[in-house]
């Protein structure tokens, strides 16, 4: 398996290096690399630095920033862009677009776990204009066509 080199921008992160929690974990926790607590008001979206920069450097891979389920379910804290896609040639700091969709202000403390980083394989495609498609059982059916609508 290819290893991705994570570069650290903030020296405080030495004590908070991302790690897989279990052998079956897919995601690495990203933390709020802030100097002070940050209050996110209901409906507000803020960019939160993670202190981490990555350069995957291999177009067969990308990274995805995903929300932590507990923050979304219990506090309404989700990603402002729903999913963050990090291309293999990006080299900057990872920032988390953080949206409070809840009804109460949320205080995000320094180094609090905020999101998850997952490395995924990528298959780039080539488009080919055709006259029609080969027939399939499903056809053009969508939006509930294979089950309960």
Swiss-Prot record:
GO terms for molecular function: dUTP diphosphatase activity; magnesium ion binding. Coiled coil: none annotated. The keyword Metal-binding applies. It catalyses: dUTP + H2O = dUMP + diphosphate + H(+). Signal peptide: none annotated. Keywords: Hydrolase, Magnesium, Metal-binding, Nucleotide metabolism. Pfam families: dUTPase. GO terms for biological process: dUMP biosynthetic process; dUTP catabolic process. Substrate binds at residues 68-70, 81, 85-87, 95. Pathway: Pyrimidine metabolism; dUMP biosynthesis; dUMP from dCTP (dUTP route): step 2/2. It is an enzyme of class 3 (hydrolase). The keyword Disulfide bond does not apply. Its EC number is 3.6.1.23. Its cofactor is Mg(2+). Disulfide bonds: none annotated. Belongs to the dUTPase family. This enzyme is involved in nucleotide metabolism: it produces dUMP, the immediate precursor of thymidine nucleotides and it decreases the intracellular concentration of dUTP so that uracil cannot be incorporated into DNA. HAMAP family: dUTPase_bact. This is Deoxyuridine 5'-triphosphate nucleotidohydrolase. It comes from Bordetella parapertussis (strain 12822 / ATCC BAA-587 / NCTC 13253).
């Amino acid at each position: 398996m290819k290893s991705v080199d994570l570069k650290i921008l903030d020296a405080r992160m030495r004590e908070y290096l991302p790690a897989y929690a279990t052998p079956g974990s897919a995601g690495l926790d990203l933390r709020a690399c802030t100097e002070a607590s940050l209050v996110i008001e209901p409906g507000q979206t803020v960019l939160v630095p993670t202190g981490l920069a990555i350069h995957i450097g291999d177009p067969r891979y990308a990274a995805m920033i995903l929300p932590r389920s507990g923050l979304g379910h219990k506090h309404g804290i989700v990603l402002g862009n729903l999913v963050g896609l990090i291309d293999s040639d990006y080299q900057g700091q990872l920032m988390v677009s953080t949206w409070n969709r809840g009804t109460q202000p949320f205080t995000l403390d320094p180094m609090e776990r905020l999101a998850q980083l997952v490395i995924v394989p990528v298959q780039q495609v080539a488009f080919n204009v055709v006259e029609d498609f080969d027939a399939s059982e499903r056809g053009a059916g969508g939006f509930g066509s294979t089950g309960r609508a």
